[in-house]
Amino acid sequence: MTHYDVVVLGAGPGGYVAAIRAAQLGLSTAVVEPKYWGGICLNVGCIPSKVLLHNAELAHIFTKEAKTFGISGDASFDYGIAYDRSRKVSEGRVAGVHFLMKKNKITEIHGYGRFTDANTLSVELSEGVPETPLKVTFNNVIIATGSKTRLVPGTLLSTNVITYEEQILTRELPDSIVIVGAGAIGIEFGYVLKNYGVDVTIVEFLPRAMPNEDAEVSKEIEKQFKKMGIKILTGTKVESISDNGSHVLVAVSKDGQFQELKADKVLQAIGFAPNVDGYGLDKVGVALTADKAVDIDDYMQTNVSHIYAIGDVTGKLQLAHVAEAQGVVAAEAIAGAETLALSDYRMMPRATFCQPNVASFGLTEQQARDGGYDVVVAKFPFTANAKAHGMGDPSGFVKLVADAKYGELLGGHMIGHNVSELLPELTLAQKWDLTATELVRNVHTHPTLSEALQECFHGLIGHMINF
């Protein structure tokens, strides 16, 4: 069969989830994917990086905090074994995607698909299968082609100038590295590499690390990374990158002052651009935004009624869980099933998984004030949380921003041990318009890190208990 109710172009977190939901709703479904089943996330992104981050955390504990926990003796850390574990976990999750495709009777088409008309894809099949392109027709299609790494203007990749993909797929570590970009990817790789003995310098063009986070969170992560020995150069522009084969020279400037950084490797991590080229979108009239992303409405529908788009290619919030949520909505919209529109991507959760974690949703304090809200803020430090002390890591805080008039949450900003696990309570509260007065009555288990949320709920209405 080469005609389907729904064809999904791309098998990343959004694509495969959309396919499963479509199949659950009784639609004949196929997925077209040339390389990474499970997407960047499962193969060379979210999943293997979290394995490496956990290994790095253990290395940090044994090298920097062993005495605190009564641990003594020599320990060695083999990055090659950590790498092997990351690949094993990744491969297991990818196998899980194939299992789910089979379980839900979804057809896998291994190849590169492009539109030839509004209801047809021509698929160049992968090696080991017939070379003649496969013609696949459909009633509806979901574009889930993801994104590609943006590079510093005027620079190129080379043997020693790499992206996250090359770094996460190597067992060998450099002695030194310059990471361009202090967003989530730059921060996470900086944490991993430093804890395995690499000399790390992070260069950020904007005035602070993690510039999309609340200013107080940025200040705290800079402090914690400085304690680890990671150098962060903020407000610094990369002028050029030169790879001579044995090392890389990075020319940077700040306030009219120039310097040259020398390292074994340079990792470019300044962000991602939607993958819109080479798929024939122009042939079917799919509209793009000014930022060259596929333009969608709140139900993931493009300007062509039977063509939908999800994930990074839409240029919304480029995170795996956002793509998954979009995929569910797209499939339900196609099937005519009950669904819920997605509109305000500012309120989606986001996290960076170094230790301490950085986790947030919604408006920063400054954004809320700039937006004209009458703002109330509560901030609770983990130095006042018993569980954090028991874990040996009381760094960081929870900061909540609320509308003073109605008491509803506008944003949450956290830095601390595993605070990414605290986000769902906050985003659920925001989505269903719960107020601080209501939230404070939700009893939190003692002792847990989540008690910091309860303290902030108390703080928003003027009576924090334990601080």
From Swiss-Prot:
Cysteine pairs forming cystine bridges in this chain are 41-46
Q: What is its main location?
A: cytoplasm
Cofactor binding note from Swiss-Prot or TrEMBL: Binds 1 FAD per subunit.
- Which keywords does this Swiss-Prot/TrEMBL entry list? Cytoplasm, Disulfide bond, FAD, Flavoprotein, NAD, Oxidoreductase, Redox-active center
| Residues at which NAD(+) binds | 181-185, 204, 269-272
Give the catalysed reaction(s), semicolon-separated.
Answer: N(6)-[(R)-dihydrolipoyl]-L-lysyl-[protein] + NAD(+) = N(6)-[(R)-lipoyl]-L-lysyl-[protein] + NADH + H(+)
Q: Which Pfam families match?
A: Pyr_redox_2, Pyr_redox_dim
Q: State where FAD binds.
A: 33-41, 50, 113, 312, 320
**The EC number(s) this enzyme carries:** 1.8.1.4
Among InterPro entries, the record links this protein to: Class-I_Pyr_Nuc-Dis_Oxidored (IPR050151), FAD/NAD-bd_sf (IPR036188), FAD/NAD-binding_dom (IPR023753), FAD/NAD-linked_Rdtase_dimer_sf (IPR016156), Lipoamide_DH (IPR006258), Pyr_nuc-diS_OxRdtase (IPR001100), Pyr_nucl-diS_OxRdtase_dimer (IPR004099), Pyr_OxRdtase_I_AS (IPR012999)
The answer to keyword Oxidoreductase applying to this record is yes
A single GO BP term for this record reads: 2-oxoglutarate metabolic process
GO molecular function terms listed in the Swiss-Prot or TrEMBL record: dihydrolipoyl dehydrogenase (NADH) activity; flavin adenine dinucleotide binding
What cofactor is this protein dependent on?
FAD
Q: Where in the cell is it found?
A: Cytoplasm
Q: What family does the Swiss-Prot or TrEMBL record give for this protein?
A: Belongs to the class-I pyridine nucleotide-disulfide oxidoreductase family.
Q: What else is known?
A: The active site is a redox-active disulfide bond.
What is the purpose of this protein?
Answer: Lipoamide dehydrogenase is a component of the alpha-ketoacid dehydrogenase complexes. Catalyzes the reoxidation of dihydrolipoyl groups which are covalently attached to the lipoate acyltransferase components (E2) of the complexes.
Subunit: Homodimer. Part of the PDH complex, consisting of multiple copies of AceE (E1), DlaT (E2) and Lpd (E3), and of the BCKADH complex, consisting of multiple copies of BkdA/BkdB (E1), BkdC (E2) and Lpd (E3).
Query: Which NCBIfam families does this entry report, sorted A to Z?
Result: lipoamide_DH (TIGR01350)
**Name under which the protein is recorded:** Dihydrolipoyl dehydrogenase
Give the species: Mycobacterium leprae (strain TN)
Gene behind this chain? lpd
